[in-house]
Amino acid sequence: MGLLEKIFGTYSDREVKRIIPLVDKIDALDGSMQALSEDELKAKTAEFKQRYENGETLDDLLVEAFAVVREASSRILGLKHFREQIIGGIVLHQGRISEMKTGEGKTLVATLPSYLNAITGKGVHVVTVNDYLAKRDMEWMGQLYQYLGLTTGVIVHDLDQKQRQEAYAADITYGTNNEFGFDYLRDNMVIYKEERVQRPLHFCIVDEVDSILIDEARTPLIISGEGEKSTEFYKVADNFAKMLRKEKDFTIDEKTNSAILTDEGVEKAEKYYHIDNYADPQNMEIQHHTSQALKANYLMKRDKDYMVKEDEVVIVDEFTGRLMEGRRYSDGLHQAIEAKEGVKVQKESKTLATITFQNYFRMYEKLSGMTGTALTEEVEFREIYGLDVVVIPTHRPIARIDAPDIVYKTELGKFKAVVEDIVETNKNGQPVLVGTVSIEKSELLSSLLKKRGVRHQVLNAKYHEQEAEIISHAGEKGMVTIATNMAGRGTDIKLGEGVTDVGGLKIIGTERHESRRIDNQLRGRAGRQGDKGYSRFYVSLEDDLMRIFGSDKLKNMVEKLGLGDDDAIESKMVSSAIENAQKKVEGNNFDIRKTLIQYDDVMNKQREIIYKQRSEVLEGENLKDQIEGMIKDLIYNAVNSHISGVDEELESDIEAILNYLDDICLPRGIVEVEELATMSNDEIKEKLYSLAKEIYERKEEEFSSDQMRELERVILLRVVDTKWMDHIDSMEHLKQGIGLRAYKQQDPTQAYQMEGSDMFEEMVENIKVETVRYLFHVQAERAPERQRVVKETEINYSGPDAGDTKKEPVRRKEKKIGRNDLCPCGSGKKYKDCCGRRA
């Protein structure tokens, strides 16, 4: 702590001081609230709603509303909010992040701002990390809200559309970040406005906010359809990768987590693939497949990054150690791993809609969050989300002892020491929770403990069904629990009888994570609500963090001391070296996320424009003016771009205009070149536009006026959706190749912004051309029907990419229209003979 902080207190101390007077006012209402009858207390909600409608603000109502929730909670749940919990609730209502230590009752804290903000009738979303917690919190806290006359809903994976609409219509809706994000994307793919499920995004409380807004910030949510590419080439590239020798044919850069061919490797590739120049842009696909095959074979580790289960490759979440069933790595990496493991290689998919969590959560009118560990990422929360972090004081002083790290030379020496520590601790009945970084390490430790005859439970991706159950017993006397990373987060570990007498829960970390926050989360499992507890990390110089990012100074010191495998050192220098290594990685990851958001912002602005236009099409009763505007733009642009201004070329220019418009909206023969050649440019535009309008009026007579309006909607929706999907793919390709611009002294992000903008404008022009073309060619054979461009069939989600510590896309899969299906434009023809011909 610096001198200024000692004198003035930290930022959080000062913010908490400002909130204390409000807490005192809420406290002062305690007696009068207790005196209210059941009916009087319940009637308060209707009173608050009326006062809000009459012009009072939520801040005006805060003191009374919080006091009402506190009293109702005491009566219904038997839990009365502590002063510290009220401070946390006020911070959340203000649209900030409450950092509250584990066991301080975050679930109860959220009831205060949720109730207050639900008074507006605009809905409150409470976001949790998994379906189990969403259901648990909704059922538990729902009793309180229902008592006070508010409705609650929960969004879980297997709900149908009607159930989702009901859940979102509730005053307070619980659910996971994935479900909220997917519903937003799906709402922007509907073909009838009645199919939408979400209301406008009003107020959101994100539980475990660091996990969702930092760890998963770069995870794109993707809804995808099946691609057409063959999967055979993955096997060809896999055979090539398996022939290579490390260091000679390729090198591995562990800091960026990438594998690169050497000159010798490039020569081998040219021979193997029968090509002259591996680096030639024509061979981009070969480079891509080879790069993914190298990644799959030499960077992705089985039982750490993924598991093979029932002949399928299943991703393991690096943050929680859970299996991510049905999720897939994008960009062909999943197929490359399938080829490596010899299981069926599935087809790549085509992206239909996508958004990152960063951009989804920034759309809420007010965003807030709570977690036990946010302060280390305070700068990122402030810069990217405009959220500040306020550390809430604990209800009772923390009694946990955090011992300094112990460092061993080798990993084996470290694990031997961990086992000895567990055996000794277990003798006196003190419960132990051991944190590991992977399934592989959990199982290694488990086998070592079995040899010593120590009874224990293993909690990792293989058994996550019993996760909450196992973790809730971890504080009982004599229990030894091994847990991967942050598995079981959100479930309290309560101490069993007699455990306080033997020192409380003991936490042993078997490796430092690259993020200090995740280490702090593991520590925070012990010593909840002033309980006794103890934590210590065991580290070896062979651990990934120390090997890749550790300082040479530390390694040299260990060499000089001549440490044996089983010898250990414990010093402040070691702890600070570890912390510096972690800061290095955190800083690096923050920079990557900042750069990526610059890229993503380009796509985000474009997405907003397209979704806004789509929404107007769904909502609008009459698109006729918009369609006529498109016809006008199209004709005016055609004239401007074709007429050169050279008199001798005028007739051939007009000929070219008529040829161009013939396929779109003006059949040849409707006007002669000679007639137009006598006119000025403006007169030509007006003449062609009036002719096109006449044809369109006649087209309207073939249908009824209502049918024509519906037809306009059907075709415009279809064209916008198809062009937008293609544009998403094009932007993804642009992003993948843009990094090379740095070699041309170009700023890649600027180049991406400019070229992405040009591509978007081109797409908008193409939407106009295609829409007008379809409308002028459609036949009056049957009433127009809206159909989806794709149908949703399964869910796909991907975890962390081997390439650069980034999280990979959450995917949901959808099916394309078959060539022989009826065309969705309503013509009555087969898709291949109608719109499919031009697709």
From Swiss-Prot:
SUPFAM superfamilies the UniProt entry points to: Helical scaffold and wing domains of SecA (SSF81886), P-loop containing nucleoside triphosphate hydrolases (SSF52540), Pre-protein crosslinking domain of SecA (SSF81767)
Class of this enzyme: translocase
Entry GO terms, CC: cell envelope Sec protein transport complex; cytosol; plasma membrane
| Pfam families for the chain | P-loop_SecA (PF21090), SEC-C (PF02810), SecA_DEAD (PF07517), SecA_PP_bind (PF01043), SecA_SW (PF07516)
State the residue spans of region: Disordered: 794-820
Q: Subcellular localization, per the record?
A: Cell membrane; Cytoplasm
This protein's cofactor list reads: Zn(2+)
Keywords for this entry? Answer: ATP-binding, Cell membrane, Cytoplasm, Membrane, Metal-binding, Nucleotide-binding, Protein transport, Translocase, Translocation, Transport, Zinc
Query: Where is this protein primarily located?
Result: membrane
Return the cofactor note field.
Answer: May bind 1 zinc ion per subunit.
Its annotated function is as follows: Part of the Sec protein translocase complex. Interacts with the SecYEG preprotein conducting channel. Has a central role in coupling the hydrolysis of ATP to the transfer of proteins into and across the cell membrane, serving as an ATP-driven molecular motor driving the stepwise translocation of polypeptide chains across the membrane.
- Family named by the database record: Belongs to the SecA family.
Q: How does it assemble?
A: Monomer and homodimer. Part of the essential Sec protein translocation apparatus which comprises SecA, SecYEG and auxiliary proteins SecDF. Other proteins may also be involved.
Q: What is this protein called?
A: Protein translocase subunit SecA
